[in-house]
Design a protein with these regions (language model features):
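Extended, subdomain-level signal for the structured scaffold at the beginning of enzyme domains
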Residues: 1-109, 119-123
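Short, thiol/selenol-centered motifs that function as redox-active sites or metal-ligating centers
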Residues: 114-115
């Protein structure tokens, strides 16, 4: 089974999150059989995030220093973009996020940053 973690930042764009959950969700039902075994999970350093235009999402998995190693086993890290006016860039220096990105980068794992999320990768 392949596992994809979608990292939720405060102020993320709901559509940019939903595109991954929807595509891979449907893929597991109607996609080619050899690609159906993909698990997508939303993760964050917060239990809930408020999206750009007000929707609230609860992360499926809260990532802490105690369980970050579990996320290191995932195959890909997706970072949806967001809006600065909704505090999207406020927590880009979060240590948990930085450790995840560093691990995925150093281990040649897939990192997908959508739109403004690229800014959160710049150090």
């Amino acid at each position: 089974m392949k596992k994809i973690a979608i990292f939720l930042f405060e102020g993320a764009e709901l559509f940019e999150i939903a595109s991954f959950t929807d595509i891979f969700g449907w893929n597991n039902i109607v996609g080619l059989k050899e690609f159906r075994d993909i698990k997508v999970e939303t993760i964050s350093y917060k239990e809930e995030i408020k999206c750009t235009w007000g929707g609230v999402l609860k992360a499926e998995k809260l990532v802490t220093e105690n369980n970050i190693e579990e996320i290191f086993s995932y195959d890909a890290l997706v970072i949806p973009g967001g809006f600065g006016g909704a505090n999207f860039f406020k927590d880009k220096e979060n240590e948990i996020f930085k450790k995840l990105v560093k691990h995925f980068y150093e281990n040649n794992k897939i990192i997908v940053a959508i739109c403004t999320a690229v800014i959160n990768l710049v150090e």
